[in-house]
Regions:
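N-terminal secretory signal peptides that target proteins for export/translocation
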Residues: 1-4
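His/acidic/aromatic-lined binding-pocket segments of jelly-roll/cupin-type domains
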Residues: 77, 84-87, 122-123, 131
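Ligand-binding loop in jelly-roll beta-barrel domains
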Residues: 124-129, 135-156
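A short, N-terminal "cap"/entry segment at the start of jelly-roll beta-barrel domains
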Residues: 20-80
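Short hydrophobic/aromatic-rich beta-strand segments that constitute the beta-sheet cores
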Residues: 67, 95-97, 149-151
Length: 157
């Protein structure tokens, strides 16, 4: 009987004591600031006279954070089912967002491009700025020399 009581007390003590912390899953991928700088330099070297380069940086399954290197503006765009989140890494430019896309045409699944945006809002962009363009909102990047973004698409909920 004494052994049973001691075993019960020991079990209760074990249940009340905090156990070791459960291991947290590590990120699927990571990139240091030095690695990002090296990738941006490599992208610039590979581009030559090109005006746009895209390179995935980190990913977890289908979710990808990628570097976008712009030397010249592209066409205004709309991602009907995805928001676009980005951090300016280098360079400068402008973001025009909102308004109405003129002459919209689906150029590939998930991307509608047009000739211009009427009535959008303009915002200057520089290193450290963060943007979030909601799904379905027209947007366009003006480029001043170069604009390097770290961005990802976020599915519409």
């Amino acid at each position: 009987m004494v052994i049973a009581k001691l075993a019960g007390v020991a079990l209760a003590a074990l249940l009340l004591c905090p156990g070791p912390a459960m291991a947290q899953s590590a990120p699927a991928d990571a990139a240091s600031a030095a690695e990002i700088r090296a990738k941006v330099a490599a992208m610039a070297a590979r581009m030559g006279k090109g005006t746009f380069a895209y390179e995935p940086l980190v990913k977890d399954g289908e979710t990808i954070a990628a570097l976008e290197y712009w030397k010249a503006p592209g066409k205004p765009a709309v991602h009907p089912d995805e928001a676009e989140y980005a951090l300016v890494i280098e360079g400068a430019g402008t973001l025009v967002s909102g308004g109405t896309m003129v002459e919209p045409a689906e150029t590939r699944p998930g991307l509608v491009e047009g000739s211009r945006i009427d009535g959008g809002s303009t915002r200057r962009l520089g290193p450290g700025d963060v943007i979030l363009v909601p799904a379905g909102v027209p947007h366009w990047f003006g480029i001043e020399g170069k604009l390097v973004l770290l961005g990802m698409k976020l599915p519409r909920k």
